[in-house]
Every structure is written in structure tokens, then in C-alpha cells.
């Protein structure tokens, strides 16, 4: 490869990445998932597109995609709160194991019939497209404001269901290559190996990496590089040992993100850019790999297979997988069924048969790609609509314009939050002493226009003021309410109820006010929060609703695992 060729690659790569970034703004305007934009640009640059770039290097695509997935899952793990495991761990693991098997089996049987294949080859197609994709789920769920039970279940499922899909795919490829038609006891051994190595080495590697980062004295810019290189090392090591590198790197990130770590803010900020670059690069390469003309001959059966999986196989697997978990209501189960997003992982798995030289490998690849496109276009574009119809969107609290980590003490992660006050903020005209700031927070600076003011308690806030507040992450909900907009208060009332009650209120007092019909066995001296927990059972989350005694009770606020405020609304016939 000469210098001119290398420079041409740099030029083409830079143009494609820049075009992806610039055109990503059309995603929200058109209601199209941003991943589809990246895929489309790659396809336009490919053999059948305007660019005419001939790219059929499957090993290179496999390399780029796996590297990108490792970075995306490391970032996703760091941003997943360990508290979400309280409500979602076991349901997500059920979907990640039994759910994938059911989806793959049902989809594979229909694939064998639609494409006139042997049962085992049909099951291979089912295994390839059987898992949801972490990159797609993390990208499309971000900022949707779903209740914690649903969002955490979907995110943990997408980060942990790839081992089952990889295991099924590799096992079926080996069986087809060896001419076998039945499973042996080694099937279970390989499954345990995939999950076991992924969990053990992922957590051990994450712990060692955390220790190394906190012990080493480095330039601030090197900590993110150490974290990402360590995560990739964990991914590669587990994969080399025939474990699930995808699960390992996710758990590694989860451990890093939920323990005190040096330069946390810098690591997260760098990871954000790396994750975006990884998504762009991965979907560009996968788009280049596809020739749209190859999809036309299989379009009808592949579309039927996609609809079968989306409308029947995935919902059935979700309803079976969530049977033991009574805390999920019907609306949540239906929504989780709909968010069976497919993305890069099925396409990467479809490269395996190509590299193994199996018959019909091109068919497997094209079918997988078609299913991914249908999933992103059909499910991805309707995600917000489905969430609203299922009434799973919790009214958001105001987020700061920006947040900057101060990196003063890794055991106390102080940050600077910046809020800009527009005319619709209720606090306009209030004095600083009137603001009920969360305990431990301080207003560090107040900007008015280009001027830095020296405020006192009597300083009144004006439209356009910029407040710099020092606090910690757990202060964000209270700060968001403090600087909230008036319309959000009305939205909260529509969602949470006509009245928002303090959960510490005595049940006896609430009973007298609302005329509740309490059973004689009910302890009237308990608090409203304790009684609501009894009504819900399980692990409640903000937005959970239940009808009792002619009233709708909604959990409006929680502090850690404790219900702090409850919304009450009178049940009407219309509702």
C-alpha cells in the first residue's frame, strides 16, 4: 500500500465521518434513528451507491465492529447506575437467556420455511438475529425519560444477552461445519464458559483496572486512555479464552462507573466522544459492506421474517421471560416487547458464517442486515410514540446546561452545574435567600450578560442569568425542581395526580381526609409511604401507578429505596 493510497483512505474516512456528524442533525427532525443515518451514508458510499467504494473485507469489518462494540459497552457500563440492578437485574437476565433462546428458536423455524433451508440452518439465522443490540438500545433510549424499571431492564438486557446469541451462533456453525444434526452435552459446558468467564474476568479485570487508575499519578488526559485500553484488554482476553468479551467489558465499565475513580468527569467526557466515534465508524463500515441490490431478491421473505420476529417471537419471549416478575404491568411488558431493537451485533454475527465458509453464508448475512434495517426503521422510529402510548414517560426534571467535574476528591465527586434562567422559570424575580438550595450545595457564581456579579442574599434573579452551582450528582433532582419551568408543574400534576402528598404523613390522617376504606387489619399508624409500598409490592420506581379505593396512587419521588412523595388522583370513568 503506497502513500497515495493511504492518504486516500484518510481523505475518504474523514469525509464519511464528517458527513455522518453533520447529517446526524436530520435524525431528530425526520424522526429517524441516528444509527440509520450512519448506515445509509455507508451504503451510499458503497458499491451500489454514489461513492462506488468496493469493500468486501469481512475480517476488517469484524475487527472494526468488535473494537467499536467494546468501547460502546464500556461507556454504557460506566453510565449504568448500580441502583438500577435493584429493580431490573433478574428480569433482564431472564430475557437475556431464556428470551434469546425462545426468540432464536421461533424465528429460526420460520426462517427455515421461508428460505427453504435445513432446520439447523434456519436456527442459525434465528441465533444471529436473536439478541437485542446494546449500541442501538443505549443510543435510542437515551433522553426518552422512561421509568427506571423499563429503561434499566432494556439496557441491562442489551448489555448481557449477546453471550447467548454468540454462543448459539458459534455452536450451530460448528455443528453445520461438522455435519452434526443434534446437540451434545458440551452445549451446556460452552454456555457456562461464555457467561462464567465473562462475569468473572469482567469483574476482576474491572477491579484491577480501577485499582491501577486510582494508584497511578498520571496526566489527566491519560486516565481515559488507560481506562479504554484496559477495557479493550479485558474484552480481548475473555474473547481469546472463548468467553463473552461483550459481557466482560460491560461489567468492567459497570464497576468503574459505580466506584470512586480518579478523574471520573474526564473519563466520562472522553468516553462520550469515543462512543460516538465508535458508533459512526461501526455503522459506516457495516453500510459499506452491504450491497443494497443483494437485498432485493430476499426482500419479501426477509420482511415477513422481520415482522414475525417483531410481532410474535419477541413478544412471546418477553411475556414468558417476565412471567415470574409480577412488578411489570401489561403496558410495560408490551413496550419491552416492542423495543427488541436489532443493530450491529446481528450483522457482526452474520460475518461468522462468511469467515467459516459455510454454504448460504451470503444469504445469512443479507437476511440479518435486512432484519436490522426493518427493526431500526420500524421500532426505532416509533419508540417515542410507543412510550407515550404506554404511559411510561416520567416527567423530567430540568437538567443543567453543562456540568464540569472538579476532581477534588474521588470519594466525593464534586461538580459544577450551570443553569441558565429563561423567562419561564418560576424563580425569576426571587432573591437568592428565597431559594431553598439542597443541603451541601452552593452558588459559586452568578453571570448577568457578560458581567460576573458579586451576589448577596438580596440579589434578585433576572431572565438570562447564568448560575454556577457546586454540588454532587445526587443533588441534581432537587436542583432541577428548584430551577424548573412553570409548565412542568402542570405536567407533573397531569401525570402524578391532583395532589402530591408527603410520604411521611400518617396513614390515619390521609384516611380521614380522603375517606379511605381501610381494613381493620391495616396499621393506621404507619406512614403513607409504607402503605404504598405494601400496595405495590416488589421494587417500586418513580411513575408506578395503582388504583385503590377509587383513587390512583402514583409514586412521584423516591430517595434511595424510600418513597418520599406520592401523587393522588380521583379515578374517573374516562380514565
From Swiss-Prot:
It catalyses: K(+)(in) + H(+)(out) = K(+)(out) + H(+)(in). Gene3D superfamilies: 1.20.1530.20, 3.30.465.10, Regulator of K+ conductance, C-terminal domain. The keyword Lipid biosynthesis does not apply. GO terms for molecular function: flavin adenine dinucleotide binding; potassium:proton antiporter activity. GO terms for cellular component: plasma membrane. GO terms for biological process: cell volume homeostasis. InterPro entries: Cation/H_exchanger_TM, FAD-bd_PCMH-like_sf, FAD-bd_PCMH_sub2, Na+/solute_symporter_sf, NhaP2, RCK_C, RCK_C_sf, Transptr-assoc_dom. The chain crosses the membrane at residues 3-23, 30-50, 58-78, 95-115, 122-142, 172-192, 194-214, 221-241, 244-261, 270-290, 293-313, 334-354, 363-383. Residues 403-485 form the RCK C-terminal domain. SMART domains: CorC_HlyC. It is a multi-pass membrane protein. Keywords: Antiport, Cell inner membrane, Cell membrane, Ion transport, Membrane, Potassium, Potassium transport, Transmembrane, Transmembrane helix, Transport. It is found in: Cell inner membrane. It comes from the Bacteria. Pfam families: CorC_HlyC, Na_H_Exchanger, TrkA_C. Belongs to the monovalent cation:proton antiporter 1 (CPA1) transporter (TC 2.A.36) family. NhaP2 subfamily. NCBIfam families: PRK05326.1-1, PRK05326.1-2, PRK05326.1-3. HAMAP family: NhaP2. K(+)/H(+) antiporter that extrudes potassium in exchange for external protons and maintains the internal concentration of potassium under toxic levels. This is K(+)/H(+) antiporter NhaP2. It comes from Yersinia pseudotuberculosis serotype IB (strain PB1/+).
Amino acid at each position: 500500500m503506497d502513500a497515495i493510497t493511504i492518504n486516500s483512505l484518510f481523505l475518504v474516512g474523514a469525509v464519511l465521518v464528517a458527513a455522518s456528524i453533520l447529517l446526524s442533525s436530520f435524525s431528530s427532525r425526520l424522526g429517524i434513528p441516528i444509527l440509520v443515518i450512519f448506515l445509509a451514508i455507508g451504503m451510499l458510499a458503497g458499491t451500489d451507491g454514489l461513492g462506488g467504494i468496493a469493500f468486501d473485507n469481512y475480517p476488517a469489518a469484524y475487527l472494526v465492529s468488535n473494537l467499536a462494540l467494546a468501547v460502546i459497552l464500556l461507556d454504557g457500563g460506566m453510565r449504568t447506575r448500580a441502583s438500577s440492578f435493584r429493580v431490573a437485574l433478574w428480569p433482564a437476565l431472564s430475557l437475556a437467556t431464556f428470551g434469546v433462546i425462545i426468540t432464536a428458536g421461533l424465528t429460526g423455524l420460520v426462517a427455515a420455511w421461508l428460505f427453504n433451508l435445513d432446520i439447523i440452518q434456519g436456527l442459525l439465522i434465528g441465533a444471529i438475529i436473536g439478541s437485542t443490540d446494546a449500541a442501538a438500545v443505549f443510543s435510542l433510549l437515551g433522553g426518552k425519560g422512561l421509568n427506571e424499571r423499563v429503561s434499566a431492564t432494556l439496557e441491562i438486557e442489551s448489555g448481557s444477552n449477546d453471550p447467548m446469541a454468540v454462543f448459539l451462533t458459534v455452536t450451530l456453525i460448528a455443528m453445520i461445519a461438522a455435519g452434526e444434526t443434534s446437540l451434545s452435552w458440551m452445549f451446556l459446558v460452552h454456555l457456562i464458559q461464555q457467561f462464567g468467564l465473562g462475569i468473572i474476568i469482567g469483574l476482576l479485570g474491572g477491579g484491577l483496572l480501577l485499582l491501577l487508575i486510582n494508584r497511578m499519578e498520571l496526566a489527566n488526559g491519560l486516565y481515559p486512555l488507560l481506562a479504554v485500553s484496559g477495557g479493550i484488554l479485558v474484552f480481548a482476553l475473555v474473547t481469546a479464552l472463548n468467553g463473552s468479551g461483550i459481557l466482560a467489558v460491560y461489567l468492567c465499565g459497570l464497576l468503574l462507573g459505580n466506584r470512586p475513580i480518579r478523574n471520573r468527569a474526564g473519563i466520562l467526557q472522553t468516553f462520550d466522544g469515543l462512543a460516538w466515534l465508535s458508533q459512526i465508524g461501526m455503522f459506516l463500515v457495516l453500510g459499506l459492506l452491504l450491497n443494497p441490490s443483494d437485498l432485493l431478491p430476499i426482500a419479501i421473505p426477509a420482511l415477513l421474517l422481520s415482522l414475525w420476529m417483531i410481532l410474535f417471537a419477541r413478544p412471546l419471549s418477553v411475556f414468558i421471560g417476565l412471567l415470574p416478575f409480577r412488578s411489570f404491568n401489561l403496558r410495560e411488558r408490551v413496550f419491552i416487547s416492542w423495543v427488541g431493537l436489532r443493530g450491529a451485533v446481528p450483522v457482526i454475527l452474520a460475518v461468522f458464517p462468511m469467515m467459516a465458509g459455510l454454504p448460504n453464508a451470503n444469504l445469512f448475512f443479507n437476511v440479518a442486515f435486512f432484519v436490522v434495517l426493518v427493526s431500526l426503521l420500524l421500532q426505532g422510529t416509533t419508540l417515542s410514540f410507543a412510550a407515550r402510548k404506554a404511559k411510561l414517560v416520567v416527567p423530567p426534571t430540568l437538567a443543567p446546561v453543562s456540568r464540569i467535574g472538579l476532581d477534588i476528591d474521588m470519594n466525593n465527586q464534586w461538580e459544577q452545574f450551570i443553569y441558565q434562567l429563561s423567562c419561564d422559570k418560576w424563580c425569576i424575580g426571587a432573591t437568592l435567600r428565597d431559594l431553598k438550595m439542597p443541603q451541601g450545595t452552593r452558588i459559586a457564581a452568578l453571570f448577568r450578560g457578560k458581567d460576573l456579579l458579586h451576589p448577596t442574599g438580596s440579589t434578585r434573579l433576572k431572565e438570562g442569568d447564568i448560575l454556577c452551582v457546586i454540588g454532587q450528582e445526587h443533588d441534581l433532582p432537587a436542583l432541577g425542581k428548584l430551577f424548573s419551568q412553570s409548565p412542568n408543574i402542570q405536567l407533573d400534576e397531569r401525570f402524578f395526580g391532583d395532589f402530591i402528598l408527603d410520604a411521611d404523613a400518617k396513614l390515619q390522617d390521609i384516611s380521614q381526609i380522603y375517606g379511605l376504606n381501610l381494613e381493620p387489619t391495616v396499621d393506621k399508624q404507619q406512614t403513607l409511604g409504607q402503605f404504598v409500598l405494601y400496595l405495590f409490592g416488589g421494587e417500586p420506581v418513580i411513575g408506578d401507578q395503582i388504583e385503590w379505593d377509587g383513587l390512583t396512587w402514583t409514586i412521584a419521588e423516591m430517595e434511595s429505596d424510600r418513597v418520599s412523595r406520592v401523587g393522588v388522583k380521583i379515578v374517573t370513568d374516562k380514565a
